[in-house]
């Protein structure tokens, strides 16, 4: 509970001119040997109406003098008790400290406010259950090097404590402490310093670590390699450059930059590299499935001109990384056919399908390549893109006329007939007559014989006229290039039509005339 006088003193900001020294003393607004006290704003005071101090600075002075009355007044004015304790320590005013010790939860909280080592150690001593290691830990934390120097002999003996303080100095980034410990007592392993510097992105500590290593005179190549791998993997250009000052392999940096898509790191060094090295990095980028931006960066330094196309294609296929092909295609460097050819020749239908999807290759293009390489499995699997069987047949049928190789046409005819055989009965009716003419045109005797049997199996009354017309049409299509097997099939069916008397006299004469021509072809 505040007294009425305390409430008045707390909120009194303007002192009347009529207040003399006696009145001010009675109000508790007078500081012996200093003069009147007046509050200014939230955190300053006015002494003798001409000297302005911060409330906390005044608290430190009052504490040093052991003036509890002024301390209480300044605490009313929202000063920080910690500054009064610091002042009391500087003036050895322990009676004042004891009056407020119940209000101090932990003297460690005061340590960050202390500037000199002597007061720092005295403050720490107020914490009853703390020992020397605790003091040294806080001295390290708050960069109190003189305290560490005072206990140098003890640190020289206690290796574990020394190593612990060194690690803490790294975590708290206390460079003076780090340098002093290493130069006076040495640390068994400096790796912790580099690891923390990298994790905190602290280039100053990292550089200091190499200075200390250099002073030892034993910078190992494996050490440099590890650091280059770590820093390049994180894209830390300045750390990489600092490491390279002491040696190391630039290829490690470039490999990591490609692997982790650090373009700024790559761009810095690419300008210095010969073309062959950049091409090797491009292959690595394909292998690691690098990002679009990384690939574009490498390609731009090659002017989108790749000399070793075969090697690039091998990497694209082996690592299933097609993005580089798309990027080159945008620059009118078309490698799709080459990629497709190698995939169709050497790999499964599933892998070909993956490449087709990634590079947006049309099914027709894939099927033509598969026909050229005699990969029936790929033709069949690719045709399943068209889910409707009739559509599959129509598309494959249209492709027959675009195939230049006879062996390719025969293979495609076999695939088409296989699809036809698996159709439902009603669906077969829709395509059988068209396919029969295709088979005749392509000299596919086996398939023609098979489909003619299917035509005969249909309802005679309904389909015989249509079948008769099919035979007549096929007979007209027969040329001297036709195979004898198809001619024999047609002869047999024409004889059957004569016997069944379903052919007109005019059609009969036409058949005889066509057969005569065919027979003459056979005898030539």
UniProtKB/Swiss-Prot annotation:
- Tagged with keyword S-adenosyl-L-methionine: no
Tell me the superkingdom of the source: Viruses
Name the UniProt key words of this record, in alphabetical order: Late protein
Q: What induces it?
A: Expressed in the late phase of the viral replicative cycle.
- Similarity annotation: Belongs to the asfivirus MGF 505 family.
Q: What does this protein do?
A: Plays a role in virus cell tropism, and may be required for efficient virus replication in macrophages.
Record protein name field = Protein MGF 505-2R
Source organism per entry reads: African swine fever virus (isolate Tick/Malawi/Lil 20-1/1983)
